[in-house]
Amino acid sequence: MTLLRSVLLAIVAASSLPAAANSCYVTAETSGAVPPPVVTEKCFEYQGMDDDAIDWVCQDNEAVKNSRREIRDSCPSGHFGICTAAITPETLANERATGSQATDTPGPTTVPREARILTYHYESTDRAQARIDCESAGGEWSQ
């Protein structure tokens, strides 16, 4: 009876832990008058990876001015486009290093072959450029 009670208590305790974050919301704005400032607002998430894999790349870094990263449970609705690309070891450190941009450097094989990064775009000074950047890096654009 005591063993059963301990097992049930362990299950309840584990299920009451906060869920691991699995998305990262990023806002950024360049400064300066020429060229005009570039504003971006996006959220990315990993598929086929552990839920906590995004925690390191989503750390808000004070050294990067005019940029803010926030860990969230999920990306919100309201995007104008989604870029889907393969995750590489480099993507785990820099979410923009995806697909063909990250295939030249051999890395550890700890990333599952089917792992993907989905980047939801909400705000961009040049929406067409967001699609061009996605596709030229080996990603697939959808709306």
Task: Enumerate the predicted regions with their spans.
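N-terminal signal peptide c-region/cleavage motif recognized by signal peptidases
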Residues: 16-18
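Bacterial N-terminal signal peptides that target proteins for export
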Residues: 1-8
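Mitochondrial intermembrane space
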Residues: 20-143
